Amino acid sequence: MAAPVDDMFSRCVDSAKASNCVDVRFINNVKGKGLFAKKPFKKGDTIFIERPLVSSQFLWNALYKYRACEYCLRALETAEENARRLSGLPALILPHPELCKVRPDRHQACPQCQVMYCSSECRQAAMDQYHKILCLGPSNDDPDHPVNKLQDAWRSVHFPPETSSVMILAKMVATIKQTQDKERWQRLFTNFCSRTANEEEEIVHKLLGEKFQGQLGLLRNLFTTALYEDRLSQWFTPEGFRSLFSLVGTNGQGIGTSSLSQWVHACDALELPRQQREQLDAFIDQLYKDIDKETGDFLNCEGSGLFLLQSSCNHSCVPNAEASFPENNFLLHLTALGDIGPGEEICISYLDCCQRDRSRHSRHKILRENYLFICSCQKCLSQMDDADMTSEDEEEVEGEGETEGEDMEDEMTDV
């Protein structure tokens, strides 16, 4: 059963404003639902701001000391601490330290398990939603605790670059176990798209690799031992657990936070004399070179979340909106990339900028493998006569002339 429209806006920072700006409509049986503008938007306008139903930092990311608030994923390192760790330069001093927005004096630990939060508000919010169930207390570092065994098993089958976390599933169960309004939360979670059994297997295969059947069984057993709930018994069956994995694998929205990135943006906004501006820009350029040499591409605290309203956005290779996290936490800002008129569908891209510039065939290959649909956006339709082969620099890796599955959907829904 799909969530009522009122529920669709329930996680927005200003739900009344959001419901006056956009509308979720059923399009057809192929595309499912979509998000539509109810008023005009200009380029750069914030369409809505939304918090996730649940979110979680990736497990390898946390293990490698990317310190983030357990609840909202706000980066906990100061910009200088972050820069020192990423660059491998422990004596590095950042100019303009006043531009760092991290406030260590506000950080709080759970008194039972010592998990860290960026504020008392986040600690209380986690406790109110799921942490009473998931708090390990003095067993936080016990490798034999069922939740720790579940996390270790997940890390053993899902390596960086990460795209999901089994703790999203754990928080879904813990939320329902802990809440008084169990029916409402179950309704919210079941709002996300459903798949056929074969499609679910493809998604799980993508997440867990060739031996996914055995790995999925192991994870289900550990998940059941750690979190079984009679009311949710269907979620713990082989079919139900596979469906949960499919839901998170298809609908999870990546979240990235960085205190250093926030500091750099604040530096860019400074009004400085020319010489000082050149010196600061040179310092930042060199810092990123040092970080690239030491750390590579892994700069952010990374995780994912389930966003109810944003999940209604369909994909386009020429999107008119994009999701970002400018507040250095899990609050998703959906922003217009161009002017959007009333009644126009609001689409995002499931591809990054580099992927969107690749050939139609390459784009379709990525979308098929990760989201199980064939795109029929304006750009793809205009390139229908292009040869069915990947870009020249991709041919050796991906092969030539792969045919598109006739049974694939024309459009993605609910991601």
UniProtKB/Swiss-Prot annotation:
Instruction: Spell out the Gene3D superfamilies in the cross-references.
Output: 1.10.220.160, 6.10.140.2220, SET domain
One example of a Gene Ontology biological process annotation: regulation of stem cell division
Q: Which Pfam families does this chain map to?
A: SET (PF00856), zf-MYND (PF01753)
Record's InterPro entries?
A: SET_dom, SET_dom_sf, SMYD5_SET, Znf_MYND
Instruction: Give the UniProt keywords, A-Z.
Output: Cytoplasm, Metal-binding, Methyltransferase, S-adenosyl-L-methionine, Transferase, Zinc, Zinc-finger
Give residue ranges of zinc fingers (MYND-type).
Answer: 95-135
- Where it mainly occurs, coarsely classed, is cytoplasm
Which SUPFAM superfamilies would you find in this protein's record? HIT/MYND zinc finger-like, SET domain
Write down the PROSITE patterns for this protein, in alphabetical order: SET
**Which function does this protein serve?**
Protein-lysine N-trimethyltransferase that specifically catalyzes trimethylation of 'Lys-22' of the RPL40/eL40 subunit of the 60S ribosome, thereby promoting translation elongation and protein synthesis. May also act as a histone methyltransferase in the context of histone octamers, but not on nucleosome substrates: trimethylates 'Lys-36' of histone H3 and 'Lys-20' of histone H4 to form H3K36me3 and H4K20me3, respectively. The histone methyltransferase activity, which is independent of its SET domain, is however unsure in vivo.
Q: Which protein, by its recorded name, is this? A: Protein-lysine N-trimethyltransferase SMYD5
List the taxonomic lineage.
Answer: Eukaryota, Metazoa, Chordata, Craniata, Vertebrata
GN (gene name): smyd5
